[in-house]
Amino acid sequence: MNWILCLSLTLLLVVQTAWGALHTKEPLADTKYGTLRGKQIHVGKTPINVFLGVPFSKPPVGAHRFAAPEPPEPWEGIRDATTYAPVCLQESWGQVTSMYFNTHKRYKWLHFSEDCLYLNVHAPVRARGDPLQPVMIWFPGGAFLVGSASTYDGSELAAREKVVVVVLQHRLGILGFLSTGDSQARGNWALLDQIAALRWVQKNIEAFGGDPGCVTLFGQSSGAMCISGLMTSSLARGLFHRAISQSGTAVFQNFITPDPLKVAKKIAQLAGCNHNSTKILVDCLRTLSGAEVMRVSQKMRFFKLHSQEDPQKVVWFMSPVVDGVVFQDNPIVLLTQGQVAPVPYLLGVNNLEFNWLLPFIMKFPMSHLRKETIAKLLWSTSTLLNVTKEQLPLVMEEYLRDVDDHDQKMLQKHVMDLAADATFVYSTLQAAHYHHNAGFPVYLYEFEHYAPGTIVKPRTDGADHGDEIGFIFGSPFSKGHSSNKEKALSLQMMKYWANFARTGNPNGGKLPYWPRYNKDEKYLQLDLTTRVGVMLREEKMAFWKRLHQN
């Protein structure tokens, strides 16, 4: 009997010690790979445990470059998790977009490294006996070229909605997507990183108070596209239970690179690694320093307007491929066949997707426009817009027929609408349609409010690409510079997103009712005054549907 009493007292001491750690300023979390020491912060009076720079893979360097991620090495003792890890190597404009999307009170300058497969966890402090909390995993956007976990502070969302917020980062650009189309470099390294992070969450999130059986993926732009793509991948099946795509889906035509070997050879030529043997080519690229890889990336001029080049030869960005591992077929094909994860899906767009940020990054001119110059611009970007040379006159007629050639304001507006509809809006509505037809719950939105407090862009009369992010992460509270109505909108959106994470339905409490997307095509217009809309951009979407069906 004495040994039973001794064992009981020991177990009680262990539980009390672990419990106490969660309620100290230096909380501990016991993962499968070792113990982490985080820090405790307060959002108002609510304590949040924060763990930063948590490894979910071995560093993807040396022989691990252009290879699938492997689980991290276990460590002895207690690992410090109170500072951000470096972010993945990326284009120089990543600093600008990080400043643009930053949800911290103060901007965090980025530090770059190829050793970058880390995530951050923001978790509410649980009272004894509390159930495990829903988990929300954020996929940053950035045209597959930029993006970082340290840009996003999940503490406001975690505190106000009692969810565990995980923010991941993955390899980018050449390092994240290079593919030779064969076994030497199948590609999709970034998506394999994402899947590795999801597997880490399944194995370890209980140590932070998260429920591995209630995981929601949410992301923006290219991050949203990856989420949409992973919904068609058997590798990701069972690793999440709901999905949210903000301004991006795998229906976007450029999500899949059709001829990856052609792109790889162009990169290899610029790097001095060109060879008929893909093994020698890849081995050569592995010998480059990170700085050399980024110099090659700059020479590729990703996501920049190529006005003098045949658009068929332009590589807009590195992106996923059909590799037979992550994707057995193009996700568009799988979506049309209803081969998609059986989970609820919330998705939407902003009403001014191509207003300032994307033209600024692309160096797309938005002044001194004439219809003649617009025609040339559209031809230069035709592969991005998914239109042929023969279709361009039809597109010009649809969007510019009633606009005077000297009315700069209207020309600019219609060009912005054209680009947004061709890239984000039409593909989002198609994705909503496919998921609805597959028989799973769908909720559609259009966000319409300008994001306050962003220092690097001019004020607009609507929501630019990414403007919704701050409202979902509670920036009106953490950063200030917001009206009471904007704070109310942020509270509303955090509640919608968290309700969806909890139940698969954004509705609940006193929130304005959000109807499910069905054959009536109802959606929610998110603004200071929230209302239900029907058939988003009906006339223009009918035009794009006719154009792509002919």
Curated annotation (Swiss-Prot):
Residues the record marks as carrying a glycan: N276, N386
Keyword Glycoprotein applies: yes
Signal peptide extent: 1-20
Major localization class: secreted
Gene Ontology molecular functions: carboxylic ester hydrolase activity
Active site: S221 (acyl-ester intermediate), E353 (charge relay system), H465 (charge relay system)
Gene Ontology CC annotations of this record: extracellular region
Disulfide bonds: C88-C116, C273-C284
Stretches that traverse the bilayer: none
Matching InterPro entries: AB_hydrolase_fold, CarbesteraseB, Carboxylesterase_B_AS, Neuroligin/BSAL
Keywords: Disulfide bond, Glycoprotein, Hydrolase, Secreted, Serine esterase, Signal
Pfam families the UniProt entry points to: COesterase
Subcellular location: Secreted
The protein's Enzyme Commission number: 3.1.1.-
PANTHER family attached to this UniProt entry: NEUROLIGIN (PTHR43903)
Family that this chain belongs to: Belongs to the type-B carboxylesterase/lipase family.
Entry function: Probable carboxylesterase.
Protein name: Carboxylesterase 4A
Taxonomic lineage from the root: Eukaryota, Metazoa, Chordata, Craniata, Vertebrata
